Structures are given as C-alpha cells and as structure tokens.
Amino acid sequence: MIRMPLATASLLAIAISLAGCGDDKDKAAAPQAAAPATSTVAPAAGAVDEAAAKAVVKHYADIVFAVYSDSLSTAKTLQTAVDAFLATPNDDTLNAAKAAWVAARVPYLQSEVFRFGNTIIDDWEGQVNAWPLDEGLIDYVDKSYEHALGNPGATANIIANTQIQVGEDKIDVKDITPEKLASLNELGGSEANVATGYHAIEFLLWGQDLNG
C-alpha cells in the first residue's frame, strides 16, 4: 500500500493565388477564331473567393474546437484517475493515474499551436503548462538538486510545511486550495516556481527528474 501525506494528496487533487500573368500577344498577329462562350466566368486577378475563405475559417475553427474538447475530456479523465489514486493509493491506481497523465498531454500539446492565434490563451496557459519548474517549491528533493539562480522559493517545500518564508514574506500554506496554489506560481518573481498544472502533477506522480 502506498502511503501519502495529506498535504500531498490535497496538492495532487488540485492540481489546446498564385496570379499568373500571360505574355503580351503580338498585336500584328493574325486574328484567332473566337472561342465558344461558356457559363463560367474566371474571377478577376486578386479577387477573394468568399465561399472558399469562409470554408477555410470554419474548418480551422472545427479543428480547434475538437482539439480543445479532447484536451478537456482527457483532463477530466486524469482528474478521475488521480481521485481514485488518492482514495486507494496502490501501484495499480498510481500507474492508472500516470497513464491518464500521458494520455492527457497529447491533445494539450496539439493545442499549443493555437496559442499564436489567440492571446487570451496566454492569460491562463502558465497556470496549466509552465515549465521548467523548481520541484523544491512543492516537496522534498535530492541533495543533488539544482534550482534556478536567485529563486527564493526553490526549497520552500509546500507539502512539508504549514508556513513558508520567501524573503521577508511569510505565507500560510496550512490549507491547500486552488486559489492558494495559483497564487504561488511565480512566487518571489521567479518563473521556476510552479505550483499548478501538468508538470506539477507530473512531479507528484513520478517524483523528481534526476536525469537532467
């Protein structure tokens, strides 16, 4: 049976024309026979095909909607798997939560391309996908741990403490809530302080990355 501190469980729980120009004809050339009239009129050079443009926009919107829908669905599945792990912590539920995390990352990573077309996404993206992170903000780390230079919260260890101190500020972390965790992102002005999102959950499920 896997035993987990209540703080760890709480933190883990809270935790998308080429326009061709023909050569001029020789005006002295012999006249050619007139071609039969047709019902199709070629669009003027540079003209926009409104129907085609609308079709492209609709297709793009459909793709975006599908990707974000998949991302939301798999995130909810991840939440369910994490809840099951917290309720019954063992190897099976842990592995199921890890598998759900991996599955949830696929559509979310696909959604990253759409950030460049909608700046609103950047308002919350950091709460979901910020990286890299100093794991010592969240929990204990190996002695070989190296953190971002000048990060005052690099070894704060939210899970092991009811209060953390960053510089002259003392922060109550006795009760871990979504709002509290969100407020700890970029703590002390360091982008390496990440308390929410996929990578914080990844650390809680797999532990510290010692391969880098």
Where are these regions (language model features)?
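Mature extracytoplasmic or organellar-lumen-exposed domains after removal of signal/transit peptides
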Residues: 42-212
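Flavin (primarily FAD) cofactor-binding/catalytic cores of flavoenzymes
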Residues: 12
